[in-house]
């Protein structure tokens, strides 16, 4: 503690007369340093998000992955993950090969074995887009079973993304290397990357693979957990789990599996979520065609914690939790009521997510948001009539003189006609 007129050394000497003060200060400094070094949320990825060192790695000639599997056990109380991964590799080169895998920087790798024999491995200091590179040398044998164990906290280079790496009894999301180490330089076999994923979670949680596959319960345990299993065919993968409510809806020639958090159930029912999904799917499929990312039969609509707007893939699409708050559903700029705001957000499955059309130029009168507003207007006009649609979707954008407002709300970049 600095003392007036005594300088740093004099102040230290006077403060040291009470020993607990400098000891407490030193302890606090040590705790600050330890907290910074052990920060579980932030990795040290290359800040250049366009870097593609890992993505552009040359594949190994003569090495292929025939099958892989993972057994994952998140600890929802501590917010950590433990798992075992196995890779069935075919090495036709007759030589030892170095296999590279992407691992989340927060995991510790251990017990790496090839055909049951422990082998050396190394993890790179360089990190890129939430991954470090794990390198292992597999033997010259033609058939190699590579197994390893991993565990820790999956770090994130975007720590401000709420829910991005949440691991709790209500919600979790494990993406790619956070789910299991991802093969970087091994090509798929003739059948692709067939994979079996098992995950053990509290019984109240529902497991939702972000793909066309469905997870099923294969075991129930005495400690109040269940083991889920699903099959997929890709090098990585994304898995959501949480306390979800599932509604099955027939619309647009598809079976829609609509998943949303149980805490939003009252809001969803009051907003007529199921009816909104049905109206949007029927209208948009009839006027614009099928979704670009459906599998032709089923589509999962999954409400995430927060994903900055959502995204879509093979047979699944993500909806942002923020879209379904009472505040957003009451936004008059997106509709005349909660049900219409719900329609607006669902229309983004067609206009948005980077699937249905190229990004518009800065001078284009249309955008994903503009097309969504216009489509919402057309759906509401069909459901409730032209007068209602004009009142809530045209007149509100006009001033008292009947002309368009100079600065309409940013939610809509077009004027319905």
Predicted regions and their residues:
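Bacterial N-terminal signal peptides that target proteins for export
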Residues: 5-24
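Bacterial N-terminal signal peptides
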Residues: 22-33
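N-terminal, polar/Ser/Thr-rich
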Residues: 36-82
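Ligand-binding face of N-terminal immunoglobulin V-set domains in extracellular IgSF glycoproteins
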Residues: 84-101, 105
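Extended, low-hydrophobicity, Ser/Thr/Pro/Gly-biased non-transmembrane segments
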Residues: 86, 149-244
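A surface-exposed beta-strand-loop module
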Residues: 104-166, 224-225
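Juxtacatalytic substrate-recognition/specificity segment
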Residues: 248-364
């Amino acid at each position: 503690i600095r003392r007036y007129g005594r300088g740093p050394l004099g102040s230290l000497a006077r403060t040291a007369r009470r020993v607990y003060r400098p000891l407490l200060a030193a302890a606090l400094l040590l705790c600050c340093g330890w907290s910074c070094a052990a920060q579980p949320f932030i990795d040290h990825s290359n800040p250049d998000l366009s870097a593609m060192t890992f993505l552009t790695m040359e594949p190994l000639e003569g090495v292929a992955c025939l099958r892989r599997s993972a057994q994952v056990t998140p600890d929802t109380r501590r917010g950590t993950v433990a798992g075992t991964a196995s890779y069935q590799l075919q090495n036709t080169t007759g030589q030892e090969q170095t296999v590279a895998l992407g691992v989340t920087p927060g995991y510790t790798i251990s017990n790496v074995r090839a055909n049951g024999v422990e082998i050396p491995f190394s993890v790179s200091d360089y990190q890129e887009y939430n991954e470090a590179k794990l390198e292992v040398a597999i033997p010259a044998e033609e058939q190699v079973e590579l197994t390893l164990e991993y565990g820790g906290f999956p770090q994130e280079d975007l720590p401000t993304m709420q829910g991005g790496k949440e691991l709790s009894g209500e919600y979790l999301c494990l993406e790619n290397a956070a789910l299991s180490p991802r093969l970087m330089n091994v090509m798929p076999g003739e059948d692709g990357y067939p994979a079996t994923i098992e995950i053990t979670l509290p019984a109240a949680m529902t497991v939702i693979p972000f793909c066309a596959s469905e997870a099923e319960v294969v075991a129930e345990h005495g400690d109040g957990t269940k083991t889920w299993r699903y099959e997929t065919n890709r090098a990585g993968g994304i898995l959501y789990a949480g306390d979800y409510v599932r509604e099955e809806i027939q619309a647009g020639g598809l079976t829609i599996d609509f998943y949303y958090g149980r805490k939003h159930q009252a809001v969803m029912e009051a907003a007529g979520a199921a009816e909104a999904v049905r109206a949007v799917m029927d209208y948009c499929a009839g006027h614009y065609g099928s979704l670009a990312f459906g599998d032709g039969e089923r589509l999962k609509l999954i409400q995430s914690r927060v994903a900055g707007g959502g995204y879509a893939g093979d047979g699944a699409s993500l909806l942002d939790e923020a879209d379904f708050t009472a505040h957003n559903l009451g936004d008059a700029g997106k509709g005349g009521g909660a049900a219409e705001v719900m329609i607006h957000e669902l229309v983004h499955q067609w206009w948005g997510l980077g699937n249905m059309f190229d990004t518009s130029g800065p001078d284009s009168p249309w955008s994903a948001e503009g097309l969504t507003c216009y489509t919402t207007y057309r759906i509401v006009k069909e459901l409730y009539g032209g007068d209602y649609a004009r009142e809530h979707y045209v007149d509100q954008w006009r001033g008292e003189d009947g002309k368009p407002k100079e600065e309409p709300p940013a939610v809509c970049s077009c004027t319905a006609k």
